[in-house]
Design a protein with these regions (language model features):
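Helix-boundary and loop/linker segments of multi-pass membrane transporters
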Residues: 17-20, 58-62, 98-99
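Membrane-embedded catalytic scaffold of the fatty acid hydroxylase/desaturase
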Residues: 31-40, 63-191
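Membrane-interface helix-loop junction between the first two transmembrane segments
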Residues: 12-24
């Protein structure tokens, strides 16, 4: 593949971090994932409703800030375990590997998601419904986490000092995406380090 042609195909920015073919591939995968999200919402939603209705402890008070803080931290905890297993077990890795296949690291990489993840992800969040997290608190917290996940996929944000000691940042998420042996399967959390 001609490097000059590849440079011409870059979407211009100061670091040439967006090659058109890679960015378009990531965006196309994100669009495909969006269509499978309807299945995830339907399947997961039905199971969550059933668990919330039949097996849940008393529902937490959604007007309490403590409910939201605990739900936010608990969501990140269960995401960590989902993400860790996605790196350690082949059936999960087969679904997650697409996200790590981009040769570039930019915002479009966040969109590079598989369409098969819905088969596996929702299972990890069942405990939240068992302990009494209201479904609309869960949906809100999941949405905030999803938005947060987007911005950490960039090379354009420098190190953020003390922030990186507590929260996932673009810098330490770049380590997660690195292919160096010592960095593989590191920094698996979504929000908290």
């Amino acid at each position: 593949y001609d490097r000059r042609r590849q440079r011409q195909m870059c979407i211009r920015d100061s670091n040439n971090t967006y090659r058109a073919n890679d960015a378009l591939s990531s965006m196309f995968m994100g669009a495909l994932r969006s269509t499978s999200s309807a299945l995830k919402i339907g399947l997961g939603g039905a199971v969550f409703f059933f668990v919330e209705t039949h097996f849940s402890l008393p529902r937490w008070d959604s007007s309490s800030i403590l409910t939201w803080i605990i739900a936010f931290i608990a969501y990140d905890f269960f995401y960590y375990w989902f993400h860790r297993i996605s790196h350690e077990r082949q059936i999960f890795w087969a679904s997650h590997v697409a996200h790590h296949q981009s040769e570039d690291y930019n915002l479009s990489t966040a969109l590079r998601q598989t369409g098969t993840g819905f088969f596996l992800t929702w299972v990890f969040y069942i405990p939240l419904f068992i302990i009494g997290v209201p479904s609309y608190v869960f949906v809100s917290v999941a949405s905030i986490n999803l938005i947060y996940q987007f911005w950490v996929h960039t090379e354009h944000v420098p190190k953020l000092g003390w922030f990186e000691l507590f929260f996932v940042s673009p810098s330490n998420h770049r380590v997660h995406h690195a292919q160096n042996e010592e960095y593989i399967d590191k920094n698996l959390s979504l929000i908290h380090i």
